[in-house]
């Protein structure tokens, strides 16, 4: 079945038995909006392709989803954006910004959860913030640190930091196990 793209479930199956779809032509799961929609970006296609491949090979694997994002260097000026970043006037959203020298950071929150990020100039650790956004982590205990140039894993409460590190280790172990299978 199709809408704006091929309709798929969280295992990337289509409405036809044995047929899977992902990438630019499929309506993948957007973890922020909690809906399936077109997400024509390379990371979503790559992860979707791996997930579809595992499912076609009999390894039941659920697609975690993606959201809109982009990273680029414009005349040696790096920029990373992900999620919902143009919501200044929307009710219920909190926007935090920081402008220092050649670095700009913007974090958009809803209910103490990150729903958007925009980094320019110095984009270090944007991946940490993206991970917090993807996993829907409540950042109320350290949200004031999010736009700091020194923000990193050490800025998080110890229990959360240990949990995040454990997730990273488990993810690498799962990846190795899937490659061996």
Predicted regions and their residues:
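Mid-to-C-terminal Rossmann-like scaffold of FAD/NAD(P)H-dependent oxidoreductases
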Residues: 25-127, 176-181
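Short, charged/polar low-complexity linear motifs in solvent-exposed/disordered segments
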Residues: 33-34, 111, 132-135, 158
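A short, polar/charged loop-to-alpha-helix boundary motif
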Residues: 123-140
């Amino acid at each position: 079945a199709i809408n704006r793209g091929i309709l798929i479930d969280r295992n990337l199956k289509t409405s036809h038995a044995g047929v899977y779809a992902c990438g630019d032509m499929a309506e993948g799961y957007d973890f922020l909006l909690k809906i399936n929609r077109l997400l024509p970006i390379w990371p979503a296609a790559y992860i979707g392709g791996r997930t579809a491949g595992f499912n076609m090979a009999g390894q039941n694997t659920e697609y975690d989803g993606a959201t809109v994002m982009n990273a680029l260097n414009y005349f040696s000026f790096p920029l990373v954006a992900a999620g919902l970043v143009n919501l200044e006037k929307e009710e219920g959203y909190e926007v935090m910004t920081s402008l220092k020298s050649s670095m700009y950071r913007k974090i958009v929150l809803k209910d103490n959860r990150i729903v958007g990020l925009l980094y320019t100039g110095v984009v270090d650790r944007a991946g940490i913030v993206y991970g917090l956004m993807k996993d829907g982590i409540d950042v109320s205990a350290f949200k004031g640190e999010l736009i700091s140039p020194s923000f990193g894993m050490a800025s998080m409460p110890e229990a959360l930091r240990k949990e995040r590190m454990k997730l990273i280790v488990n993810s690498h172990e799962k990846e190795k196990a899937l490659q061996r299978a």
